[in-house]
């Protein structure tokens, strides 16, 4: 089949030379052409199977390599998707941690503000109580010193009932 196509192709190429009217009787172009076609046919006969098997094996190698590359690409894409999913989860976890930390910081701040307020109120109450005690103590000492001075002085005389009445009215 292939040889027939070659012969027809060769004849089509030589047809313009035949139409020109040149005298090619003195040349051996036809014999050489037939020898060439025979050589190509014999070469094709012996090498066709090897050439086909070589091309087929190369085609199989290429398709096998293509399948391997596609499998690697698929694995890479799956790995990328997995990593992107893990990244999203990590971002969500980080946002959750930050929000929890902010809530906890607010709670701790409120707790310490309340504790500080209570401590200040207690300090104020304690200082007022201490001031009241000191005032009472100073009044008592003053009254005692005045009564002591009055008793020691002979100008005024008090009995116990008068002292009790004065103390009740002043304290």
UniProtKB/Swiss-Prot annotation:
The keyword Lyase does not apply. GO terms for molecular function: proton-transporting ATP synthase activity, rotational mechanism. The keyword Cell inner membrane applies. It is found in: Cell inner membrane. Its main location: membrane. Pfam families: ATP-synt_B. It is a single-pass membrane protein. The chain crosses the membrane at residues 2-22. InterPro entries: ATP_synth_B-like_membr_sf (IPR028987), ATP_synth_b/b'su_bac/chlpt (IPR002146). Keywords: ATP synthesis, Cell inner membrane, Cell membrane, CF(0), Hydrogen ion transport, Ion transport, Membrane, Transmembrane, Transmembrane helix, Transport. GO terms for cellular component: plasma membrane; proton-transporting ATP synthase complex. F-type ATPases have 2 components, F(1) - the catalytic core - and F(0) - the membrane proton channel. F(1) has five subunits: alpha(3), beta(3), gamma(1), delta(1), epsilon(1). F(0) has three main subunits: a(1), b(2) and c(10-14). The alpha and beta chains form an alternating ring which encloses part of the gamma chain. F(1) is attached to F(0) by a central stalk formed by the gamma and epsilon chains, while a peripheral stalk is formed by the delta and b chains. F(1)F(0) ATP synthase produces ATP from ADP in the presence of a proton or sodium gradient. F-type ATPases consist of two structural domains, F(1) containing the extramembraneous catalytic core and F(0) containing the membrane proton channel, linked together by a central stalk and a peripheral stalk. During catalysis, ATP synthesis in the catalytic domain of F(1) is coupled via a rotary mechanism of the central stalk subunits to proton translocation. Component of the F(0) channel, it forms part of the peripheral stalk, linking F(1) to F(0). Belongs to the ATPase B chain family. This is ATP synthase subunit b.
